[in-house]
Amino acid sequence: MPVVAADPKRGHLRSVLERRRGYELLGDMDGDSICRYSGGVLRDLISLARDAAVEAYIAGHDSVTSQDIENVAQQLGTGYLRGLGPEEIKILHHLEKSKSFDVSQAANVELLVTRRVLEYSSTDFRVHPALLSVMPSPEPKSA
């Protein structure tokens, strides 16, 4: 069953971080970055916040920095990228460019259930933001 993500621009994700006292280590902008990179997936939000705190601790920072967040977002994105072949990456680039996604195709369903593509509504599908941040550029078309 695909994950229906919460829109990361809404306050729900921020309230989760606030309830978990995440803002004690995060600035407002850093919290917004974590919400954005999570794509609205609660599991990813919590993982990113926890991993950013660990990253900051290991680096000897007193609080989470934007670089800590970039590092853990890249790690999450790389995890989603792992195992994707050229065809799947082509599908993701097509989705990003056209905003069109056919859920009747088996390859597309696989991208949905593995959270590489997030469903915000029945007509709003997006590439997971952490994956998008590390995705290789599209192959140039041959002449």
Language-model regions: role of each:
Residues 1-31, 35-37:
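The catalytic "switch" region of P-loop NTPases
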